[in-house]
Amino acid sequence: LVPQPHMNNLLNKIFFRSQNLNYINSGFKDIKKNTEVDQIFRAIHSFSKNSEIRYVGGCVRKIINREIVDDIDLAVNLSPKDVCDALNNKNIKYYESGIDHGTITALLNDIKFEITSLRKDIDTDGRHAKVEFSNNWKEDASRRDFTINSIYSDIEGNLFDPFEGKKDLENGKVNFIGDAEVRIKEDYLRVLRYIRFFLNYSKDKHDPKIINAIKKNLSGVSTISSERLLDEFKKLLQSKNFSKLSKDQDCLEIINLIFPQFKNISIFSKLNNFAQKNFSKVDFIFLLSVLVIDGTDNVDYFIYKFNLSKKDKKRLLFLNSFYSAKFTSKTFLEKNLNQIFYFNGKEA
């Protein structure tokens, strides 16, 4: 999600604080000054005397780690129906984006806020979870994947951190909540999520138990839909530390087994520091083309296997069409290069 200018201003006010010991608390406290956030919190708190709402997951992790935050996720101890009623009472627009899984998306001044009811897993099959709504915060935290993603905060910046995720984040450790193999079997997409978070946050070596659990259950990744798989890889590819992948033999081996079509991962390690830090600003399809274009029919197979949209398919095939031409000085002219950048920029 690319924030609107208004969202950028909001996030700048909220999250870019001075570097001091009160960083976390001051970052969260500033949110109260924002109209949109304040409206949502007031709507939930006024619904009943026992209703609670907290920030959760990525936005809390990023605030603690002093990162740019591009979305805000919220957790509540109300049922989805009660969340809808609470928003209706305050005339806040919303849509039921994932109500079966407990998620309501509030919309204020074109800013989206995902509000999810506390849950516990009743059944899992490696792809989807059957959930039951709860009012127990630790129960909700225990179903999350990693300790660094199970940190909650109220509007004042007071943390609820039952699995010491803040400590792991500060120490550069990426730990599953509970047994790694059990958590992977609940949702095999966690294999890719582990790699993304490890490359971005780890300051240590892999826990051998985690790597063994991943390799033991790697075949389960094939049960994940191509859409979910590619969406998660997109987050990995556009993350700030993707270039580290080629230097991490465990992660590289796993990615090569999941995506054998990626032929040129090592090329990213050769980019300069400026380029590596700006991955997230580069269009996904353009980055993807670097991985899959190799002068064979690899691109066609990748498009078929991952069911790319017509727009993405067109762009990838366009970039592929220039692969052989770039080695022929007679046909590959400056205008061809300009066309590539124009086409890529226009469609990005």
Sequence positions of predicted segments:
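Catalytic cores of the polymerase beta-like nucleotidyltransferase superfamily
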Residues: Q4-A348
